């Protein structure tokens, strides 16, 4: 009887130890952000000046929780003080100056709260350009219960064409 009791106690202790180790490996987050790269490709004839010559253009990318404030924001207010205009809807902001015919990348780890990117191109002729674009981001991925089984989400590539007087999403795909 003592032999069986000792065996049960050892198995029980081993089971509790294993459960404790596995619980220690459990992820506390239920979602993981999807990392992404924004590829900004400028057209050869982008942002023409008064004489029609292509010129560099500044492109600003906002990582957003919601697009409500961005959709209605004035260009000049966004450029002057984006935090005042977008408030807590803005998570991150990155800018690049792109030369005609060139490509720039913005790499981001993403955020579980991010829902979209707001993209603004600072064209010379704002009144005759489509300077604002919203691109939906992939949803944060649900994590596994045990962290050691968890793989990082695949990085997504978001291609944005910065055309003569408009910004357009080309496509979103895994890298």
Over which residues does each language-model region extend?
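Short coil-to-beta strand junction motifs in C2/discoidin
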Residues: 51-60
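Short amphipathic, basic-aromatic surface patches that mediate peripheral association
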Residues: 38-50
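Bacterial N-terminal signal peptides that target proteins for export
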Residues: 2-15
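Tryptophan-paired
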Residues: 73-111, 125
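C-terminal motif of bacterial Sec signal peptides marking the signal peptidase cleavage site
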Residues: 21-24
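Glycine-rich, aromatic-bearing surface loops/beta-hairpins
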Residues: 132-175
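A short, solvent-exposed beta-strand micro-motif common in secreted/extracellular proteins
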Residues: 115-125
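Bacterial signal peptide processing site
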Residues: 26-29
């Amino acid at each position: 009887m003592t032999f069986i009791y000792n065996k049960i106690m050892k198995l029980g202790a081993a089971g509790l130890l294993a459960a404790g180790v596995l619980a220690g490996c459990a992820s506390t987050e239920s979602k993981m952000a999807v990392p992404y790269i924004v590829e900004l490709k400028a057209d050869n004839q982008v942002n023409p000046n008064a004489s029609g010559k292509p010129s560099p253009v500044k492109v600003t990318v906002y990582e957003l929780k919601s697009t409500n404030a961005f959709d209605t924001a004035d260009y000049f207010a966004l450029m002057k003080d984006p935090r005042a205009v977008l408030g807590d809807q803005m998570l991150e902001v990155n800018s690049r100056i792109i030369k005609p015919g060139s490509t720039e990348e913005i790499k981001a780890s993403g955020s579980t709260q991010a829902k979209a990117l707001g993209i603004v191109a600072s064209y010379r002729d704002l009144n005759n350009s489509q300077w604002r674009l919203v691109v939906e981001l992939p949803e944060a991925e649900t994590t596994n219960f045990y962290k050691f089984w968890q793989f990082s989400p695949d990085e997504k590539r978001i291609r944005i064409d910065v055309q003569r007087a408009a910004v357009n999403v080309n496509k979103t795909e895994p890298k």
